[in-house]
């Protein structure tokens, strides 16, 4: 409809593996759809999201830049403005990660923040945790103060503002002793609010609250006043993310051309490893490294496509052919021949037998030739 590529998908044949992976990373899904709701700077980057448009503030104000804006007329009268934002850190379609991280990506982590931390710390050597746990009562209250896990060695003393994300069923979040402070791209000033509501949260996705001052208390409540059974709250670490992004982007797969069924590009690496791609895994994909067919690997809970590559500079081509495509062509041709045979059955039988069914062969009639007298009769004188 809008003629652009998007991460959001509605399909009756949506892969169950895609749904499972989206769920584990905190993105919104249903039985026949997956959505951009629940994205973080990491998941937006992993799926190569470059742009976002909105009629107001962007979803991740700390991680985008205003690219352009345009006014338009509303059907109901008046006018509005649409803003185009560009993400600051977008990973390419493919990049190298440690092959040993496959096990981590396929494991269950308990909550999406731990899952995302596991990705960055295992995908690259020296990767840092990008989410740090906050104090909560486990159900409906968050305090803007760190409660670091045992394996989180980050020194976060002196933090004055927390970029807070949380995950639970829900939701309206209300701030006490502080306010949500988002970077405003429209008026270049700080905007504040004390509450934020999230739609369709019964499908469980990560909610981004925004920048909250240290010590503030956030109360979480469900719109239908139902009890919240569990809640996870973390602060995003922009410094760690910048560091991890540079590590992940060190060996990018650079696309040189693409179409609906073919992607071509190059990759340079000084050691063999796993090429991670955000291409949904499907047996219809074939990959060729320097012209030689290579094996694809299902990664990220079987949702995405990976390829093992050796050290060096490689030309890597992905080709897609729907499963059963050639068998379908053969069956279609055979079916067409059978149909034509039924339609022209009588004529085919005529050609085979050399005569029409039930007709008689006409007999040859002798030709009677009439003599014509060309000579005039003789007259006696």
What does each model-identified segment do?
Residues 1, 59-61, 173, 325-326:
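Flexible loop/turn segments at secondary-structure boundaries
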Residues 1-47, 91, 97-101, 108-115, ...:
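Extracytoplasmic/lumenal acceptor-recognition loop(s) of multi-pass membrane glycoenzymes
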Residues 6, 53-56, 89:
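Short, flexible loop/turn elements at secondary-structure junctions
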Residues 30-74:
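Periplasmic/luminal catalytic loop of GT-C fold multi-pass membrane glycosyltransferases
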Residues 45, 58-63, 79-135, 224-243:
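Catalytic cores of secreted or luminal carbohydrate-active enzymes
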Residues 71-74, 92-97, 103-108, 122-124, ...:
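Solvent-exposed loop/turn and edge beta-strand elements of beta-rich ligand-binding domains
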Residues 127-368, 372, 378-381:
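Active-site-proximal, structured, solvent-exposed surfaces of multi-pass membrane proteins
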């Amino acid at each position: 409809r809008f003629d652009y590529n998007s991460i959001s998908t509605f399909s009756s044949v949506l892969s169950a593996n895609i749904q499972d992976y989206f769920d584990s990373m905190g993105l919104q899904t249903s039985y026949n759809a997956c959505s951009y709701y629940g994205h973080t700077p990491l998941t937006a980057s992993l799926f190569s999201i470059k742009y976002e448009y909105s009629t107001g503030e962007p979803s991740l104000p700390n991680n985008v830049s205003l690219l352009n804006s345009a006014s338009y007329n509303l059907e109901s009268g008046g006018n509005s403005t649409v803003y185009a934002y560009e993400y600051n850190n977008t990973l390419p379609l493919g990049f190298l990660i440690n092959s040993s991280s496959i096990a981590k990506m396929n494991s269950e982590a308990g909550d999406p923040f731990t899952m995302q931390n596991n990705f960055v710390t295992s995908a690259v050597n020296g990767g840092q945790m990008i989410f740090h746990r906050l104090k909560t009562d486990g159900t409906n209250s968050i305090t803007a103060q760190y409660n670091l896990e045992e394996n989180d060695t980050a020194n976060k003393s002196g933090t004055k503002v927390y970029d807070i994300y949380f995950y639970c069923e829900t939701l309206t979040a209300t701030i006490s002793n502080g306010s949500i402070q988002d970077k405003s791209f429209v008026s270049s000033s700080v905007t504040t609010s004390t509450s934020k509501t999230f739609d369709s949260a019964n499908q469980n996705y990560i909610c981004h609250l925004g920048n909250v001052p240290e010590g503030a208390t956030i109360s979480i409540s469900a719109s239908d006043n139902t009890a919240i059974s569990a809640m996870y709250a973390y602060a995003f670490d922009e410094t760690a993310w910048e560091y991890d992004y540079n590590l992940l982007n060190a060996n990018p797969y650079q696309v040189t051309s693409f179409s609906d069924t073919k992607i071509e590009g190059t990759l340079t690496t000084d050691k063999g490893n796993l090429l991670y791609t955000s291409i949904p895994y499907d047996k219809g994909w074939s990959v060729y490294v320097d012209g030689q067919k290579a094996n694809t690997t299902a990664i990220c809970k079987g949702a995405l496509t990976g390829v093992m590559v050796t050290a060096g500079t490689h030309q890597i081509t992905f080709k897609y052919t729907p499963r059963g495509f050639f068998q379908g062509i053969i069956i279609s041709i055979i079916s067409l021949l059978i149909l034509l045979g039924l339609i022209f059955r009588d004529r085919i039988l005529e050609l085979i037998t050399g005569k029409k069914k039930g007709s008689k062969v006409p007999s040859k009639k002798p030709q009677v030739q009439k003599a014509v007298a060309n000579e005039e009769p003789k007259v006696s004188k």
